[in-house]
Regions:
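Conserved N-terminal catalytic core of the sugar/cofactor nucleotidyltransferase
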Residues: 1-73, 84, 182
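Basic phosphate/pyrophosphate-binding loop/patch that engages nucleotide-derived ligands
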Residues: 3-7, 13-14, 64, 68, ...
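Hydrophobic packing residues within well-ordered alpha-helices of enzyme cores
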Residues: 5-9, 147, 189, 211
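Generic beta-sheet signal
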Residues: 47, 72, 97-100, 121
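Acidic/His-rich active-site region of diverse nucleotide-sugar glycosyltransferases
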Residues: 51-52, 109-123
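Structural beta-sheet core signal
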Residues: 57, 71, 96-99, 170
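Catalytic-core segments of class I nucleotidyltransferases/pyrophosphorylases
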Residues: 68-70, 77, 81-90, 103-105, ...
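Single conserved hydrophobic/aromatic residue that forms the stacking wall/gate
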Residues: 201-214
C-alpha cells in the first residue's frame, strides 16, 4: 500500500499549513500564511511486492549513502530511545545492532554473551525467558555486502554470517514492546490504547534521519 504513504507525504505541506482559498469574482487563488512542518527528507521506495526482507534493504542502497541507518519492520510498537540505541551502536563499532527484549512470545530468540554480542539464534516457546529480536536495528553500510538479491531473507544467511563473524550486537530494551503479527496482538494493542496506555515519546531529535522499512 505504498500509494497511501506517498499520498500522505504529497499532501503533507498542504495539510499542515494555514491557507486561504479565494474564489471571489472568478478568482482561483491560494495563499499560504504559515506552515507547521517537520524538518524531514523522506524517500519512499518501491521494493517489490514479493521481495524478501534482505532484498528490500538491498534495494535502498543507492539512497542510504555511506552513513549508518536505522531499520525496522514497522509491525511493532516500542518506546525504545533511538538516540541511546544509536549511541550504543557507534560505541561498539560493529556492523549491526539489534534491539532485544524479554517477552513471552513464540518467536526466534537470541543467545547473548556477556559483552552483548549475539552468539546464536534458536526457536523459543511462550514460557522461554530469553530475549527476542524486537525489530529495531542500526546498520552500517557494510551490511549491503551481506545481501544478495530479492530472494535474500535478512533473518537467515545475513544475520547468521554476522553472528559467525562477531559483527552483531544487541541493545537490551526493558521498556514497552509489543508486536502486531496477528489479530490477537492487534486486539491487545487496541485494548491498551483504549485503556489509556501512555508511552514515553522521544522528543530529542536523532542525528540519523534515514529509516528503512523492510
Amino acid at each position: 500500500k505504498q500509494e497511501y504513504i506517498k499520498e500522505w507525504f504529497a499532501n503533507y505541506f498542504l495539510n499542515y499549513s494555514d491557507i486561504s482559498f479565494d474564489f471571489r469574482d472568478g478568482k482561483n487563488e491560494m495563499t499560504i500564511h504559515h506552515s507547521y512542518l517537520d524538518n524531514w527528507k523522506v524517500t519512499v521506495v518501491d521494493t517489490g511486492y514479493d521481495t524478501m526482507t534482505g532484498g528490500r534493504i538491498k534495494r535502498i542502497q543507492e539512497y542510504v549513502g555511506d552513513e549508518p541507518f536505522f531499520m525496522t519492520y514497522g509491525d511493532g510498537v516500542c518506546d525504545v530511545d533511538i538516540n541511546k540505541l544509536l549511541e550504543f551502536h557507534l560505541l561498539h563499532g560493529k556492523i549491526a545492532t539489534l534491539t532485544a527484549v524479554k517477552q513471552a512470545q513464540d518467536k526466534g530468540i537470541l543467545n547473548i554473551g556477556g559483552d552483548n554480542a549475539v552468539k546464536a539464534f534458536r526457536e523459543k516457546n511462550a514460557n522461554d525467558g530469553a530475549p527476542i529480536n524486537a525489530g529495531y536495528m542500526v546498520l552500517q553500510p557494510e551490511i549491503f555486502n551481506y545481501l544478495t538479491d530479492d530472494t535474500c531473507v535478512f533473518e537467515q544467511a545475513p544475520l547468521l554470517k554476522l553472528v559467525e563473524e562477531g559483527q552483531l550486537m544487541s541493545y537490551i530494551h526493558t521498556g514497552f514492546w509489543q508486536c502486531m503479527d496477528n489479530m490477537r496482538e492487534k486486539n491487545k494493542l487496541e485494548k491498551l490504547l483504549f485503556e489509556g496506555l501512555s508511552l514515553r515519546h522521544i522528543s530529542e531529535p536523532t542525528r540519523l534521519r534515514r529509516i528503512s522499512y523492510a
